[in-house]
Regions:
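Non-transmembrane functional regions of envelope-associated proteins
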Residues: 1-146, 180-257
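Substrate-access "cap/lid" subdomains that shape
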Residues: 137-176
Length: 261
C-alpha cells in the first residue's frame, strides 16, 4: 500500500492505549518488505518493539519450475524468502503467510513449519499462537503433521464469520479500545480485489480472505483440533476387515440385505 507506515504505529498506539485492556497479540498479515519512508518505518518499528505483542509476516517465493520428491510427488521448491524490513524484523515475531493450495486451488492444509537453507521458518498462525501461549503462560499444543509436514485445517468459520472492524474506525477512535481486551487482533486485507482470497472447503460459492484462513488455523491450534489424511493402505485393510466382519455377522444372524430393504 501507499500509506506511510506511521499509520500502523498509530494503530498500535490505539490498540494498546490502556495497559489493562490491550490485546494479547496483534498480528499483521501484511508484507512490510523494503524501506519506505524512513520516519514512518522507524515509528512503526519503535511502536512494535514497545508493544511487545506484535507479529508480522514474511513470504516464501517459489520456483516456477516444479521438481519431484522421493515419492515422485510434484512440488515447487522455495527459491527465496521476503522478510520485513530490518528494524521491524528486530522488533516483532515473524512467520510466513503462504497458504498451501491443492491441485484444485482449494486451501485444505497448512504447513506449520518449513526449513529452507538450514533455517526453520514458522507459519504466521503458529507464530501468533506461540506468542499467545507465551503471554498467557499456556503450554502449546503439539501439532500433528503428516510425512509432508502438513496438517489439515479444521475450519471453524465460513467466509465472513469472524468479526471484522474497520482499520480507519479504530484509528479515528470510533471503536472503544477495551473492545480488544485479552484478544488476538489480526490486521489484513478484507476486501475483494486485493488478491488475497482463496477457495476453501466450506466456502460454498464464496472465497475466504487470507487473514480469515489464518484465523481459522489459529483457532484450530488453540482448540487442539488437528487431523491428517490416513494411510490409504491401512484404511483399505481396515475397510476390508470391517466388511468381512459385517458379512459374518449378517450370516450368523440370518440377516440379508434383501430382507432389510
Amino acid at each position: 500500500n501507499t500509506w506511510s507506515r506511521e499509520v500502523y504505529a498509530q494503530l498500535l498506539s490505539r490498540l494498546n492505549a490502556e495497559e489493562e485492556a490491550k490485546p494479547l497479540v496483534i498480528g499483521f498479515d501484511i508484507v512490510f518488505s523494503g524501506q519506505a519512508q524512513q520516519e514512518g518505518d522507524d515509528a512503526f518499528a519503535q511502536a512494535a518493539a514497545a508493544s511487545g505483542n506484535v507479529a508480522a509476516v514474511s513470504q516464501f517465493v517459489y520456483s516456477e519450475k516444479p521438481e519431484r520428491d522421493a515419492d515422485g510427488k510434484r512440488y515447487y521448491p522455495v527459491k527465496d524468502v521476503v522478510l520485513p524490513y530490518e528494524a521491524l524484523r528486530d522488533a516483532v515475531q515473524v512467520g510466513y503467510s503462504n497458504v498451501a493450495q491443492d491441485s484444485d486451488g482449494t486451501v485444505r492444509r497448512v504447513i506449520p513449519e518449513e526449513t529452507w537453507q538450514g533455517t526453520t521458518y514458522a507459519a504466521f498462525p503458529k507464530v501468533v499462537y506461540d506468542l499467545y501461549c507465551e503471554r498467557t503462560g499456556t503450554e502449546p499444543n503439539e501439532i500433528i503433521t503428516d510425512k509432508y509436514q502438513r496438517t489439515l485445517i479444521n475450519y471453524s468459520g465460513r467466509p465472513g464469520d469472524y468479526e471484522a472492524i474497520s482499520f480507519i474506525d479504530v484509528l479515528d477512535g470510533k471503536i472503544d479500545s477495551r473492545t480488544f481486551k485479552d484478544s488476538i487482533v489480526l490486521v489484513g486485507a478484507y476486501a475483494p480485489g486485493m488478491q488475497d482470497n482463496f477457495n476453501v472447503p466450506n466456502g460454498r460459492s464464496s472465497q475466504m480472505f487470507g487473514v480469515e484462513i489464518h484465523a481459522n488455523i489459529l483457532q484450530a491450534f488453540m482448540q487442539n483440533r488437528f487431523s491428517i489424511n490416513g494411510n490409504p493402505y491401512l484404511f483399505g485393510a481396515v475397510y476390508g476387515l470391517l466388511c468381512a466382519l459385517l458379512h459374518w455377522l449378517f450370516r450368523k444372524k440370518k440377516i440379508w440385505l434383501s430382507a432389510i430393504v
